[in-house]
Structure formats: C-alpha cells, structure tokens
C-alpha cells in the first residue's frame, strides 16, 4: 500500500522502508548507549534527533516529486552557501571548519550536499537523450568537482568523496558511456601522483601510508585501525555482551560513538549481531533498488537510485575504514553513529525516496 486516502488529503508512505528504517534507528540507539559507556545525555540527544528525523522523513514524503524537481537547484545552492558559512564563520574543531553552531546544536551542511547534489543532477539530466551528450556530461562533472573541492577544503575528505560519488552515480545511471568512464578512470590513475603531492593534507597522506604499513606509526595514525581490528576479532560469534567490550570501554578504541561504532558492535554482539545489522541495511537497500526500477519516470529512477547508492556507499566506506581496507576518513555508520547532521540527512534522503516512489503523478518534461 503506497498511500492512505481521506476525504481531503492522502498520506504517502512506504510501509517497508518506514518499518525497517525505524527498526534500524532504534537498534542504533541501543548500540550507541553501549558505545558511550551508558552516557544518558548522548542517548537522549540522539533519541531526539531520531524522533524528529523520522517525523521529517514522513513530512518530506508527502510533496509531489514535481516540487523536488522544481526546487532542486535552490536546495543545492542553500547547502553550498551554508558550507561557505561554516568555512568562514564556523568554529574550528580538530583543525577543520565543518560546522555551524547554533548553541545547543551544530549543523554540518556538507551532509546536505550529498543529498541535494544528486537531486539537482537528476533534475538537470531528466529528459536528456541516451547516451547523454558531451555538453551535459562536461557541465555535470564540473559541478560535481566544484562541490567536491569546496567541501574537501574544510577539510573533509570523507564527506567530499561521498559527494563526488553521489554525483557520479546519477551521471552513470543517466547513461554515461563506458568509453567515457574508462577514459576518466585512466586519467585519474595517471594523476594520482599529482593529487598525492598537491591535494592531500599531510595527515591524510600519513593515514594512507599507515594503512599499508602500520609499523610506520603504530601508536599514532595506525592506532585506530589496529585497535579496531582487535575489537572486531575478539567479538567472535556471539560477542562479549552488552557493555562488556574491553577495547571500547577500556579506552583502547577511539571514536567509539562515531567512526568506530561498527567495531564496538562486532566486539559486543559478535558475528550474530553484525549479521542482523547487515541484514537490516541490505533490506533497506534492496527495497530502494526495487522502488528505483519500478519508478514511474526517469527523474524518480535517477533520484532513488542515486540516493540509495549514497546510503550504501557510506555504509561500505565506514566498514572498509574500520576493518582496515580503507584509510580513516571520518565516515559515520548510517543511522547509527552519533551525530545529528548525518542522521537527519539520511532521513531527508529517505523522505525524498518515498515521495518519488509513492506518488502516481509523473514529473512533466
């Protein structure tokens, strides 16, 4: 059932997505409470974000897709302006200026860019002939890299990479030719030495180097990954139990509430807990994939496909980072890690997805 009809209005929703997103969010609170050593203030704050985020998701699923099509450029522009405000006027935390402080809460506007950039690109490419022509491809790639470089300059390479992928996903789904993809990949590989020496910050280069050789800095940049691997491996099949993780609760594992909460889950709930968690993520992605291929027009297919790939990419980047396959770039575990901006951004994304999937009216060309 996609919507409920009343005399004056209809409520649009997707019961499967809503149920499993809510379930994952509630389980996430359970995991976060353990990762924070039973810190009730962390739990209460995150619970507030979850509550209002779920309401926001339902609210954003009600507008017709035409609204998102028409105002996608405005949404992206506001997001980029907020990023500039964070860069020039935001507080500096750990050497980065990524947030806008409102006193009791902070906003990380780059999280909005990863949602509204693919939305705008989908609206721009909607109606283009397949395969999309060189002009549309060039303009789209320019926009993607402009937003990528703006966000990465904060510096925030992790979110920048997701933003880069979010735009490229929509471009690929819109019919980007394999020849262009292969050529671009070759150019990227050739330019790696230049990017290494001129684009990456020293600490970012150090993280990549220690990924391949932890002995270069075992008590510095390699410490996080080493402790994370120990935590994951020690969890075994059933885990050590709720609140019993030694790596996390004895302060060997850093950032337990944010970047490395996946390792905490593995240590305390073992392979069984991870299987249940990944099952929830898998179902949400498969449901979004189903909604994408059954969407009623090309714009909706591009949006649902692009946003669902952003969701699953964030998941795999976080897991890859935690298990030592990718460098540490500061990537939250979707719908679970502490942080209101990331949480709310995904609720916005799912609200848009449900809107695209549940409305019968086609977006006019």
Q: How would you describe each model-predicted region?
A:
Residues 18-26, 30-224, 263-323, 348-352:
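Hydrophobic alpha-helical transmembrane segments of multi-pass inner membrane proteins, especially
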Residues 156-161, 240-245, 256-258, 275, ...:
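Transmembrane helix boundary and interhelical junction motifs in multipass membrane proteins
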Residues 103-113, 153-155, 236-240, 331-346:
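Glycine/serine-rich anion-binding loops at beta->alpha junctions
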Residues 1-3, 318-365:
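A juxtamembrane structural motif centered on a specific transmembrane helix
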Residues 2-21:
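N-terminal membrane topogenic signal
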Residues 210, 214-258, 269-273:
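TM-adjacent membrane-interface loops and short helices in multi-pass inner/ER membrane proteins
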Residues 9-10, 136-137, 250-253, 295-296:
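Helix-boundary and loop/linker segments of multi-pass membrane transporters
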């Amino acid at each position: 059932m996609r919507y409920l009809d009343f005399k004056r209005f209809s409520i649009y929703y997707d019961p499967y997505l809503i149920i499993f997103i809510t379930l994952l969010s509630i389980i996430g609170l359970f995991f976060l409470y353990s990762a924070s050593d039973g810190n009730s203030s962390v739990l209460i704050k995150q619970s507030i974000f979850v509550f209002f985020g779920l309401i926001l998701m339902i609210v954003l699923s009600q507008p017709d897709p035409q609204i998102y099509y028409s105002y996608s450029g405005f949404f992206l522009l506001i997001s980029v302006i907020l990023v500039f405000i964070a860069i020039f006027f935001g507080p500096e935390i750990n050497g980065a200026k990524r947030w806008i402080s409102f006193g009791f809460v902070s906003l990380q506007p780059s999280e909005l860019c990863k949602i509204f950039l693919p939305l705008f690109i989908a609206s721009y490419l909607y109606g283009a002939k397949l395969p999309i022509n060189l002009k549309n491809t060039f303009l789209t790639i320019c926009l993607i890299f402009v937003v990528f470089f703006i966000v990465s300059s904060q510096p925030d390479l992790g979110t920048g990479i997701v933003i880069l992928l979010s735009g490229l996903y929509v471009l690929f789904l819109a019919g980007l030719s394999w020849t262009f993809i292969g050529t671009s990949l070759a150019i990227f590989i050739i330019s790696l030495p230049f990017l290494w020496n001129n684009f990456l910050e020293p600490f970012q280069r150090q993280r990549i180097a220690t990924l391949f050789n932890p002995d270069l800095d075992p008590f510095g940049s390699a410490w996080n990954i080493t402790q994370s691997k120990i935590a994951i491996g020690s969890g075994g099949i059933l885990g050590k139990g709720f609140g019993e993780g030694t790596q996390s609760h004895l302060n060997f594992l850093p950032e337990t509430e944010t970047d490395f909460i996946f390792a905490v889950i593995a240590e305390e709930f073992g392979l069984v807990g991870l299987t249940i968690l990944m099952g929830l993520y898998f179902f949400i992605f498969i449901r979004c994939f189903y909604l994408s291929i059954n969407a009623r027009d090309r714009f909706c297919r591009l949006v649902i496909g692009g946003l669902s790939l952003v969701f699953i990419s964030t998941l795999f980047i976080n897991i890859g980072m935690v298990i030592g396959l990718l460098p540490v770039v500061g990537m939250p575990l979707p719908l679970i890690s502490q942080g209101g901006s990331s949480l709310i951004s995904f609720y916005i994304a799912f609200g848009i997805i449900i809107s695209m999937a549940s409305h019968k009216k086609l977006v006019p060309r």
